[in-house]
Amino acid sequence: MLTQERHALILDKLERESVVYVNDLVNVLETSESTIRRDLNQLDKAGLLKKVHGGATSLNTSF
């Protein structure tokens, strides 16, 4: 799966659920934990999500 495809799927899941977890993304996207973490870092730097311990949250989510 291409990086752009993974990013789109991560953002889609995040939009639906407000929170995504690395372990869930590993299973859904069938890729390694390090790849998911790298993707989350890239999306965080792009300002598309907020990385948290073990996953990420939507920027629209307030806890």
Which residue ranges define each predicted feature?
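HTH-adjacent hinge/linker in prokaryotic transcriptional regulators
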Residues: 2-23, 27-30, 38-63
